């Protein structure tokens, strides 16, 4: 077979290159687990049959589901073509699929009772982890799932002024509400309190998995130190939206309060909130895990104009008041927006998130992250004839790094044996924009569906929508609730959710050095007069894009 016919049938081989949508990014397949000439393939007259590449054995001795011959892009695995075996919702094996009785070198034993997801020609990534979601509407989950997000760390439980949920009563109902959605969920408690009692209550009695300290509710010395002390005691993360007015603390003061303790600094560029004008200084600090929210990604020509109205709306400002108008404008800085993209490319900012309905868009984090990668390639070039390193660096910002920051990485964030089979399948031409299928614990949960009255499932109109994993009792059975260990130790669990409870862990004493492929630290400075950003004395800037990829070609 010529290479093009082979790729169309069995997927790309080692050394083949694949373009990712219209992002301008290209990956090169590093290895292929198939045995050429004896490939595993399902279909009429193909090799996935009893006596050939299917082993006649009980499912418990093989796997429940196999994703065959898919190109995996993963911070842990690299970029390789493999098959993925799934048993009881977890990844049980990765490598060559088939029947060890008839094929040498089999890693994924496929039985006559195994369901097959044909991955030939598709790309697999771990489900994205969005750690910054304001849950002001349940419909956010539609946008998140349709973009490839399978884990959400949220705040609020509807259109209320929350910025963290502490009430055990409210958390109980919020967890129950999520039983309708096939996503893993964790809630941040409000950390803006001078007394630890409501924080401990949120963890132990409510099941919160961390804290959010927010300037709108108080990000002063006592509140920040209290949240950090409770977090250190209970091994949970603290997310910080720092004091933008510098009323109580400057960025230098905040770093002194941290005193080396780990924190996750939200929207570290500053337009989403934080110390004006130089919160970006926190990006290079060894104990600060910085993240960006998607409204400023990538830096575009309309970014400055767009954000004024969003800031006014989200923070309940009164633009007729000169002080309120000035506060909004002070947060919008073209220099830091342009530098943000470059700091991501250098690995100095390790996470991207949505800030959904708190200025961000729930369904755009994945595509804006890869649009930013494409913009950086267009502006600064690529060292090789492929973009593997850049693609893996940006994918890590969406998957393993947010999982590491919030203590979820023992369950989600990468395609590794033992982890939940939260896997997103993409057609290469739609990569980053629209998934083909979202598997939640290996079960089809969301994806492309055709006309329900058609003769085949591929008849148009094709739309993204819920699969069987999003119906009935299944969403809760295939998803988990992330909680503090204190909630499990309490022993009087009143949460009625049917989800398995999983304790977060490993959130303290970590920093950028512990993130995958995004470990750059250094002295980041912002000139308060000109807005120029430097990293270790070198100017950091990029130009605003006139257009961005993964956008109008795919969405009206």
Swiss-Prot record:
GO molecular function (one): nickel cation binding
Reaction it catalyzes: urea + 2 H2O + H(+) = hydrogencarbonate + 2 NH4(+)
Pfam families: Amidohydro_1, Urease_alpha
Keywords: Cytoplasm, Hydrolase, Metal-binding, Nickel
Broad class of the protein's primary localization: cytoplasm
UniProt modification remark: Carboxylation allows a single lysine to coordinate two nickel ions.
Hydrolase among keywords: yes
Record domain Urease: where: 127-556
GO cellular component terms listed in the entry, alphabetical order: cytoplasm
Keyword Cytoplasm: yes
GO annotation, biological process: urea catabolic process
Signal sequence extent: none
Gene3D superfamilies named in the record: Metal-dependent hydrolases, Urease, subunit C, domain 1
Binding-site positions, Ni(2+) 2: 212, 241, 267
The record's free-text note on cofactor binding: Binds 2 nickel ions per subunit.
EC number(s) recorded for this UniProt protein: 3.5.1.5
Disulphide bridges: none
Highest taxon above the source species: Bacteria
Reported cofactor(s): Ni cation
Active site per UniProt: 315 (proton donor)
Binding-site residues for substrate, renumbered to this chain: 214
Quaternary organization: May form a heterohexamer of 3 UreC (alpha) and 3 UreAB (gamma/beta) subunits. May also form a heterotrimer of UreA (gamma), UreB (beta) and UreC (alpha) subunits. Three heterotrimers associate to form the active enzyme.
UniProt-listed HAMAP family: Urease_alpha
Name of the protein described by the UniProt record: Urease subunit alpha 1
Organism: Streptomyces avermitilis (strain ATCC 31267 / DSM 46492 / JCM 5070 / NBRC 14893 / NCIMB 12804 / NRRL 8165 / MA-4680)
Protein encoded by which gene: ureC1
């Amino acid at each position: 077979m010529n290479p093009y016919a082979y790729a169309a049938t069995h997927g790309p081989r080692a050394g083949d290159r694949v373009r990712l949508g219209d992002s301008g990014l290209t990956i090169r397949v590093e290895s292929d687990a198939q045995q050429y000439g004896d490939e595993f393939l399902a279909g009429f007259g193909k090799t996935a049959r009893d006596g050939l590449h299917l082993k006649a054995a009980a499912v418990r001795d093989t796997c429940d589901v196999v994703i065959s011959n898919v190109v995996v892009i993963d911070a842990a695995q690299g970029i390789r073509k493999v098959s993925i075996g799934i048993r009881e919702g977890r990844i049980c094996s990765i490598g060559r699929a088939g029947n060890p009785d008839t094929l040498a070198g089999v890693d994924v034993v496929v039985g006559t009772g195994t369901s097959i997801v044909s991955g030939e020609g598709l790309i697999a990534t771990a489900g994205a982890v969005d750690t910054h979601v304001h849950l002001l509407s349940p419909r956010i989950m539609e946008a998140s799932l349709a973009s490839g997000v399978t884990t959400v760390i949220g705040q609020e439980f509807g259109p209320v002024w929350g910025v963290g949920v502490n009430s055990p009563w409210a958390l109980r109902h919020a967890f129950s509400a999520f039983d309708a959605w096939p996503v893993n969920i964790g809630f941040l408690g409000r950390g803006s309190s001078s007394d630890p009692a409501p924080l401990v209550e949120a963890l132990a009695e409510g099941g919160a998995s961390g804290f959010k300290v927010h300037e709108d509710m108080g990000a002063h010395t006592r509140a920040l130190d209290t949240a950090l002390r409770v977090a250190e005691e209970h091994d949970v993360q603290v997310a910080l939206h720092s004091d933008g007015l510098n009323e109580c603390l400057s960025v230098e003061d905040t770093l002194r309060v941290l005193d080396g303790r780990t924190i996750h600094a939200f929207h570290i560029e500053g337009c989403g909130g934080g110390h004006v004008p130089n919160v970006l200084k926190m990006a290079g600090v060894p104990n600060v895990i910085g993240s960006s929210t998607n409204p400023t990604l990538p830096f575009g020509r309309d970014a400055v104009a767009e954000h004024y109205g969003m800031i006014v709306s989200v923070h309940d400002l009164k633009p007729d008041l000169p002080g309120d108008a000035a506060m909004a404008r002070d947060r919008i800085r073209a220099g830091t927006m342009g530098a943000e993209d470059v700091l991501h490319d250098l690995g100095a900012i390790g996470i991207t998130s949505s800030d959904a309905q708190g200025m961000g868009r729930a369904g755009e984090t994945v595509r804006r992250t890869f649009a930013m990668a494409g913009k950086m390639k267009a502006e600064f070039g690529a060292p090789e004839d492929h973009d593997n390193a850049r693609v893996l660096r940006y994918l890590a910002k969406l998957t393993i790094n947010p999982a590491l920051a919030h203590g979820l990485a023992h369950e989600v964030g990468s395609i590794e044996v033992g982890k939940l089979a939260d896997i997103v399948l993409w057609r290469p031409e739609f990569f980053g924009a629209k998934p083909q299928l979202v598997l939640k614990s290996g079960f089809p949960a969301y994806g492309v569906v055709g006309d329900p009255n058609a003769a085949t499932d591929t008849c148009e109109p094709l739309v993204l929508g819920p699969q069987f994993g999003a119906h009935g009792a299944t969403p809760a059975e295939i998803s988990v609730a992330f909680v503090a260990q204190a909630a499990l130790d309490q022993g009087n669990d009143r949460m009625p959710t049917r989800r398995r409870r999983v304790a977060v862990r490993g959130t303290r004493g970590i920093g950028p050095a512990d993130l995958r492929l995004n470990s750059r630290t250094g002295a980041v400075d912002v000139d308060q007069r000109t807005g120029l950003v430097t990293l270790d004395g070198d100017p950091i800037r990029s130009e605003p894009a006139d257009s961005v990829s993964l956008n109008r070609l795919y969405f009206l």
